[in-house]
Amino acid sequence: MRFTKMNGLGNDFVIIDAVTQNIHLTSENIRYLSDRFYGVGFDQLLIVEPPYDPAIDFHCRIYNSDGTEVNQCGNGMRCVAQFVCLKKLTNKRNIHISTRANHIILSIMNDNRVSVNMGAPIFDPKLIPFYISQYQKTYILFLPTQIILCGVVSMGNPHCIILVEKIENIQVTSLGSALEDHHCFPERVNVSFMQIINCNNIRLRVYERGVGETQACGTAACAAVAVGIQQGLLYESVNVNLPGGTISVNWKGASNALYMTGSTSYVYDGYINL
């Protein structure tokens, strides 16, 4: 099986062309591929398939390293846009891709960064899904040893955003893993810790469900900015500074689409027998 390794700001992906290859992977296959000692290693596996709709260019299936299929991955979609151009699967600069959650539009810019129309953020608890009685800008969640104040939103996948004063002091893995499986989130949740530098700049660390702390996460960057704008803390254009690099996010609020722009990197092509 041919594959390509790419990364978006340190968030690394294995991308598989299922347009020109017949690909059938089990959860066991995916977990093996994700192993950084015995397989290839990745944060997410992205399988690019032919479209199911004539209005779409490609369909993409997204898997975490634990073998679970997920709805969305913003950084991964940017890499997919570059991948389909690199492999000459399309010559378009505006590419329509469907995922399990939605249909997104990716635009390859002149500087080879990729801008993604992520759609409008979803704050309705029923649609996130988030087991809470009614929508609020800030929620209180109870853990065995502490009380958490957070914002909750979906960008095609659920996100819990926690505002912090100093991001270096946060125990991302212990707190992230405790919140990931909180009973209020039936599909588990991605947990982000946001430090606001000013109204146009934030710092972010992310604990991704089924993965752990990662260098970057596109949907988490979008979710953090959406929550910050919704709470009146941020302007509509924000630079999100993650350990792996910076993503630009723009959102005019309400039901407007949110846009994320960032760079991608090709690493290598490979072949593996399964």
From Swiss-Prot:
Pfam families: DAP_epimerase. GO terms for cellular component: cytosol. InterPro entries: DAP_epimerase_AS, DAP_epimerase_DapF. Its EC number is 5.1.1.7. The active site is at 73 (proton donor), 217 (proton acceptor). The record marks 159, 208 as: Could be important to modulate the pK values of the two catalytic cysteine residues. It is found in: Cytoplasm. It is an enzyme of class 5 (isomerase). Belongs to the diaminopimelate epimerase family. It catalyses: (2S,6S)-2,6-diaminopimelate = meso-2,6-diaminopimelate. PROSITE patterns: DAP_EPIMERASE. The keyword Isomerase applies. Homodimer. GO terms for biological process: lysine biosynthetic process via diaminopimelate. One of its GO terms (molecular function) is diaminopimelate epimerase activity. Pathway: Amino-acid biosynthesis; L-lysine biosynthesis via DAP pathway; DL-2,6-diaminopimelate from LL-2,6-diaminopimelate: step 1/1. It comes from Blochmanniella pennsylvanica (strain BPEN). This is Diaminopimelate epimerase. Keywords: Amino-acid biosynthesis, Cytoplasm, Isomerase, Lysine biosynthesis. Catalyzes the stereoinversion of LL-2,6-diaminopimelate (L,L-DAP) to meso-diaminopimelate (meso-DAP), a precursor of L-lysine and an essential component of the bacterial peptidoglycan. PANTHER family: DIAMINOPIMELATE EPIMERASE, DIAMINOPIMELATE EPIMERASE, CHLOROPLASTIC.
